[in-house]
């Protein structure tokens, strides 16, 4: 198997064709041999019987047997006569030979019991013969006509060889033609291989499928789809890296400034304490940003979900509200959960769906004023997270969900990645996320399925 795998496709196809053609030729030869021998036996048996009947119609009483047997048949001047093709002898009932062909007929042993076709041998020989025995109409004579089996086999072999040898001779010609045609048909594959070998790693240009066999076209189309996905991934990663570098630069610069302020505030404990508090807050913001960047990067690399389960959304929302409750209380914000539907379940990855709800709640609490309420409502086909904040302008609403985008004028800290993470998780679960301003004021996010 390893040897054949190292061979080219053209050589392998040629070997397969050669093996199949050889096996087919051998099977055809066997079938042709069987059919031909059966037909030859039937034909020559009929010939023997007709010749014996013809001899039985002779007036054997008037034949001068001595003179007849003395006259050995002459060879034809032109052509070939096989002495094994046919022989005969005529006996009386007591076994006395009265007539033969002057050749092999002299050695035919007499048998008074045989009638019809029988196999036997000549006197003093081991070669098998085919005989037909017949009694003359007057009952006085026994007529036997024989033919050597080897003659029949030679005749059958000559017929079969005449039919099959031309095909055997044509096989090398067919192989040459096949190799030429295979080389011609595989030329598009060689061209495709060259295009892949010379392809720029950053190229997004699809492979040309012109002239490619239909059996290989799905491979080319799959490669083009792979190249498109790879290019999109590379563009996404480059954009992500660029945005991440830009977003990390500001908090890191701020951390450096606060560190320098703390170092220069040895004589002012109050300023030093304030700088350290701001440094701690900056570290928290940077940590949150890095966590969100890593989360978004992992989500981008997912094409399908693993470890999915049936998740009761009622339990999911209740646990998420409990998780955010302490933070909301510190900000003097009340979080309320309203269940307009029960026993609603969705198939998904528990940790990711929990992250989706937590990000929506965190965003609502972060941008809501003190003393306001965040409402979480579960319906039969969606759930809604609504705050009492100022909402967003139509221009900003159109860009909500873009990575690193934050509406202008925001005082609350943030990275602009939370809602991007929400959209990505929802997409992985086949859900739809809609952002908008609530009719009674505030910003709302609706997750529907």
Curated annotation (Swiss-Prot):
Induction: By the signal autoinducer AI-2, through MqsR. Residues 1-12, 178-449 are cytoplasmic. The chain crosses the membrane at residues 13-33, 157-177. Keywords: ATP-binding, Cell inner membrane, Cell membrane, Kinase, Membrane, Nucleotide-binding, Phosphoprotein, Transferase, Transmembrane, Transmembrane helix, Two-component regulatory system. Residues 34-156 are periplasmic. The modification Phosphohistidine is found at residue 246. It is found in: Cell inner membrane. The keyword Cell inner membrane applies. It is a multi-pass membrane protein. GO terms for molecular function: ATP binding; phosphorelay sensor kinase activity; small molecule binding. Its EC number is 2.7.13.3. GO terms for cellular component: plasma membrane. GO terms for biological process: phosphorelay signal transduction system; regulation of cell motility. Its main location: membrane. It comes from the Bacteria. Residues 243-449 form the Histidine kinase domain. It catalyses: ATP + protein L-histidine = ADP + protein N-phospho-L-histidine. The keyword Ligase does not apply. Member of a two-component regulatory system QseB/QseC. Activates the flagella regulon by activating transcription of FlhDC. May activate QseB by phosphorylation. NCBIfam families: PRK10337.1 (NF007664). This is Sensor protein QseC. It comes from Escherichia coli (strain K12).
């Amino acid at each position: 198997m390893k040897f054949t795998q190292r061979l080219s496709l053209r050589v392998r196809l040629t070997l397969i064709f050669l093996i199949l053609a050889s096996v087919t030729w051998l099977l055809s030869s066997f079938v042709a041999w069987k059919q031909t021998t059966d037909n030859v036996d039937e034909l020559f048996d009929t010939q023997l019987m007709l010749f014996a009947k013809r001899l039985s119609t002779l007036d054997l009483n008037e034949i001068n047997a001595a003179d007849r047997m003395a006259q050995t048949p002459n060879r034809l001047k032109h052509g070939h006569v096989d002495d094994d093709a046919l022989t005969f002898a005529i006996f009386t009932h007591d076994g006395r030979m009265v007539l033969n062909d002057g050749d092999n007929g002299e050695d035919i042993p007499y048998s008074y019991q045989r009638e019809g076709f029988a196999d036997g041998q000549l006197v003093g020989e081991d070669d098998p013969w085919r005989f037909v025995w017949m009694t003359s109409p007057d009952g006085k004579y026994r007529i036997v006509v024989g033919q050597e089996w080897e003659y029949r086999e030679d005749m059958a072999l000559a017929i079969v060889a005449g039919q099959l040898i031309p095909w055997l001779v044509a096989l090398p010609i067919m192989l040459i033609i096949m190799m030429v045609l295979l080389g011609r048909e595989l030329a598009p594959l060689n061209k495709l291989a060259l295009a892949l070998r010379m392809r720029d790693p950053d190229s997004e240009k699809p492979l040309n499928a012109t002239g490619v066999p239909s059996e290989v076209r799905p491979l080319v189309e799959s490669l083009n789809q792979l190249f498109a996905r790879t290019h999109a991934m590379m563009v996404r990663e480059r954009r992500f890296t660029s945005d991440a570098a830009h977003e990390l630069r500001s908090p890191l610069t701020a951390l450096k400034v606060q560190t320098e302020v703390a170092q220069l505030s040895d004589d002012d404990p109050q300023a030093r304490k304030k700088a350290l508090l701001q440094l701690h807050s900056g570290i928290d913001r940077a940590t949150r940003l890095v966590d969100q960047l890593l989360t978004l990067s992992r989500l981008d690399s997912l094409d399908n979900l693993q470890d999915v389960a049936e998740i009761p959304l009622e339990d999911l929302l209740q646990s998420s509200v409990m998780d955010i409750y302490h933070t909301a209380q510190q900000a003097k914000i009340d979080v309320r959960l309203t269940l307009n539907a029960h026993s609603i379940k969705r198939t998904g990855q528990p940790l990711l769906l929990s992250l989706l709800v937590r990000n929506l709640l965190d965003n609502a609490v972060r941008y809501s004023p003190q003393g306001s309420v965040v409402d979480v409502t579960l319906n039969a086909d969606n759930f809604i997270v609504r705050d009492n904040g100022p909402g967003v302008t139509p221009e900003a609403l159109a860009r909500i969900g873009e990575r690193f985008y934050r509406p202008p004028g925001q005082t609350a800290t943030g990275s602009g990645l939370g809602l991007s993470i929400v959209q990505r998780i929802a997409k992985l679960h086949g859900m739809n996320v809609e952002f908008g301003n609530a009719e009674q004021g505030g910003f709302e996010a609706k997750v529907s399925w």
